[in-house]
Amino acid sequence: MALSGILSKRVIAHRADENELEDDFSSSEELNTLGSEDDEDEDEDEDEGEGEGDESENEEAPDNASSEDDGDNDIKSSLSQISFGALAKAQQSLGPLKKGAKRKHGSEEEEEEDNKNTKYKKSKSDALNELRERIRRAKEEKASKSEGSRDNELLDKKHKEARSSKHAPAVQSSKYAVSRRRVVVDGENVAQVKSRDPRFDSAVQSYSHNAKSSSYATSHSDLAAAKNYAFLNEYRDAELKELEEKLRRSKKDDEKARLKKMITSMKDRKRAMENRERERQVLAKHRKKERELIKEGKKEKAWFLKKADLKKEALKEKYESMGAKERQKGIERRRKKVASKEKKEMPRSRRMVEG
């Protein structure tokens, strides 16, 4: 089996033409005929030797040995000239060897190949193990370095944070190089520049107003914008009616919840705008009244409303403009709102007793 394997490998590497195969077979036949002629000559010599004496046998013995050596050399030379294709063809014609009939030479070659393979595998496994060991060591060194750097960073942070007071200047180690670019303003504490709309910007308006005179005062730019875009209130009212109509016609719960949320948001926004407008009117009336009193000489200095007083006056103005029934409903709603707010601020133990 080993010989057949070796022959097949060599046949794959060196394929011969059909003409070479025929020539090789003819040469092998000639060798066979030569071998048969040599055998006949040897038989004739033996017969002649039997008729002669012992002296002739001693003389012909070296001649026979030399002839046999010449024949062996001729066979070896002829076999060396036979191509691998002819040998493969002969092996195929003879058929494969049986399992138990292994040649000694083939078994030795297989053992050598097995030994080489095992040595190669061992060397490969050793190289892999060595590579894995190097990778493991490199990882350990990297982890130790990272841990050391983290410890150093923590120590540096602690050293930086340790100051006499929060107003003390920051301390920087002299080991670190100073940056060539000087930080004038810290970017984190600087407010980002926002885009400005000239329609609502007081700096672009044709008149100026000191909005810092009171914290709740409304600037003239806001008033001008409200006056210029008053038609948006009509659009909002139309949109609110449309949403209420959709809510009345809708049947899906998800759609109803979404529409209710939108309607509530729009109503709250509208109510907040009305309250702001009412407070502005109350504040304008109060300023006008104080200005007239100063002109008449009844007052030397103007009296400015506080936020709480302004809200009370605005609420009073709101209830005075309502009807009787609407005023009663509003007062009841206000009372419930204040009661729930007080209940939330009350401790839980008192809340349970009074509830």
Curated annotation (Swiss-Prot):
Residues 203-217 have a biased composition (Polar residues). GO terms for cellular component: 90S preribosome; nucleolus. The keyword Metal-binding does not apply. It is found in: Nucleus, Nucleolus. It comes from the Eukaryota. Residues 111-150, 233-325 form a coiled coil. The keyword Ribonucleoprotein applies. Residues 1-178, 193-217, 263-284, 319-355 are annotated as: Disordered. Component of the 90S pre-ribosome involved in the maturation of rRNAs. Required for early cleavages of the pre-RNAs in the 40S ribosomal subunit maturation pathway. Belongs to the RRP36 family. Associates with 90S and pre-40S pre-ribosomal particles. This is rRNA biogenesis protein RRP36.
